[in-house]
Amino acid sequence: GLGGGGEWLALAEGVAAVIDFPAVQETAPMARFWELVCDARIEKVLHAGRQDLELFAHHAGRLPKPFFDTQIAAAMVGYGAQTAYANLVQRVQGVKLDKAHTFTNWSQRPLSREQLIYALDDVTFLLPVHQHLRQKLSVMGRSEWADEEFARLEVSLGAQARDPQERYQRIR
């Protein structure tokens, strides 16, 4: 997920990375990263990804597509509305994630070894959960429903596209 500092990504099955966005967001290597994020041939898999997508769109200059939100898909296959990622992983993979660093100070640098491990553990199951949900959607005949929900989210994000910092400052 994306948040206030150490950002973590599952790049491909079996490969994960931690990117310290505040340290590298304006560097040349990040330009290639944003190209990958916006590559239409690569499906981006997120959990409760609205804020992540907003930040990606802000930094990349456009909304990354296509994307798959595991929280939306989980609701469509019967896991309940707004299922937490840890609960979904436990139900789908039978693994209890350590959430001790959920409310850690992600803005403090350097990130601790424990924070880095937490961040990497947080995406380890993202692609297997995605595959499980894709299969369940297909078996239940709900793949199109999910695609429609993702399209609605995309339209919603496009309609409210603005600098996240500006949006934060407008909260009263």
Annotate the PLM regions:
Residues G1-N87:
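Conserved RNase H-like, two-metal-ion catalytic cores of nucleic-acid enzymes
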Residues G14-A16, L63, V92, H101, ...:
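Residue-level signal for pocket-adjacent positions within structured domains
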Residues L55, N87-R91, F125-P128, H132:
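Alpha-helical scaffold segments in soluble metabolic enzymes
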Residues A60-R62, K99, A159-P164:
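Short, compositionally biased low-complexity segments
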Residues G61, A75-A81, Q93, L97, ...:
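Hydrophobic/aromatic-lined pockets within catalytic cores
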Residues F68-A73, A100-Q108, S138-E149:
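Short, surface-exposed recognition loops or helix-turn segments adjacent to catalytic cores
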Residues N87-E114:
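A short, charged helix-loop
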Residues R113-R172:
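Mixed-charge, glycine-rich, non-catalytic linkers/tails in nucleic-acid processing enzymes
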